[in-house]
């Protein structure tokens, strides 16, 4: 998993509340269990004017020029600014996979759906909860200023505007540790691999009948 320490990036303001996971990555793209291949279909039903299908050549599809991700000024955005209850709906890890592969490192919103919030941390995407008035101020500035960037410092737990104004956010200490060090569940387990091997060796000596060949 990619570590997250500090990131400065272009902001894309998605001014919609209650964005659900089917809008983030529609159900027809969920057949794959690989983590890759979802970025091109992020917000597919909003980015395109037709119905997308897996493995389709998106370069030949009609683009919705009125959708914010298609605006030239937001190309290359890595900070997604959203409204309340982002990531609601059914549980699908494909949602943070799609956001991450598209290029977003963090999502800032007043609130998130619990399952999406948890899945994001496990997949290297930092969800940040700010106060309503702080999010409102960021929307106002991002929409008014082309090339608007924010700096997110996970260690300091701050979001810094171009004018130097900082907002603080809360994050669970364990989740913070995992993101700072790029540790997913497998990475955490591998930290204890020596102890696991020692236990297995000791267990095999004390209970050899459990390890005999099955005939």
UniProtKB/Swiss-Prot annotation:
- BP GO annotations: L-leucine biosynthetic process
Q: Can the keyword Secreted be found in this entry's annotation?
A: no
Span of the signal peptide: none
UniProt pathway annotation: Amino-acid biosynthesis; L-leucine biosynthesis; L-leucine from 3-methyl-2-oxobutanoate: step 2/4
- InterPro entries in UniProt: 3-IsopropMal_deHydase_ssu, Aconitase/3IPM_dehydase_swvl, AconitaseA/IPMdHydase_ssu_swvl, IPMI_Swivel, LeuD
Give the reaction(s) catalysed. (2R,3S)-3-isopropylmalate = (2S)-2-isopropylmalate
Alphabetized, the UniProt keywords read: Amino-acid biosynthesis, Branched-chain amino acid biosynthesis, Leucine biosynthesis, Lyase
List the GO terms this entry assigns under cellular component, sorted alphabetically: 3-isopropylmalate dehydratase complex
At the top level of its lineage, which domain of life is listed? Bacteria
Which GO MF term does the entry hold, naming one?
A: 3-isopropylmalate dehydratase activity
Enzyme Commission (EC) number: 4.2.1.33
Name the family. Answer: Belongs to the LeuD family. LeuD type 1 subfamily.
Function text: Catalyzes the isomerization between 2-isopropylmalate and 3-isopropylmalate, via the formation of 2-isopropylmaleate.
What is the annotated quaternary arrangement, including any partners?
Heterodimer of LeuC and LeuD.
Name of protein:
3-isopropylmalate dehydratase small subunit
Which organism was this protein described from?
A: Ectopseudomonas mendocina (strain ymp)
Query: Which gene produces this protein?
Result: leuD
């Amino acid at each position: 998993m990619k570590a997250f320490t500090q990131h400065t990036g272009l902001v894309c303001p998605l001014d919609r509340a209650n964005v659900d996971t089917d809008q983030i990555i529609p159900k027809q793209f969920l057949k794959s269990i690989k983590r890759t291949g979802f970025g091109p279909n992020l917000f597919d039903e909003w980015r395109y004017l037709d119905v997308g299908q897996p493995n389709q050549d998106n370069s030949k599809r009609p683009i919705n020029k009125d959708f914010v991700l298609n605006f030239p000024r937001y190309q290359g955005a890595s900070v997604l600014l959203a409204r309340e209850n982002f990531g609601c709906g059914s549980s699908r890890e494909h949602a943070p996979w799609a956001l991450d592969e598209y290029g977003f490192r963090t999502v800032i919103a007043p609130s998130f759906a619990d399952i999406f919030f948890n899945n994001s941390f496990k997949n290297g995407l930092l969800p940040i909860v700010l106060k309503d008035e702080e999010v409102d101020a960021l929307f106002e500035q991002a929409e008014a200023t082309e090339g608007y960037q924010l700096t997110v410092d996970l260690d300091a737990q701050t979001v810094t505007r171009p004018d130097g104004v900082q907002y603080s956010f809360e994050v669970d200490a364990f989740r913070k540790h995992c993101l700072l060090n790029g540790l997913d569940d497998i990475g955490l387990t591998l930290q204890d691999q020596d102890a696991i091997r020692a236990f297995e060796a000791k267990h095999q000596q004390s209970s050899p009948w459990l390890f005999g060949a099955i005939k």
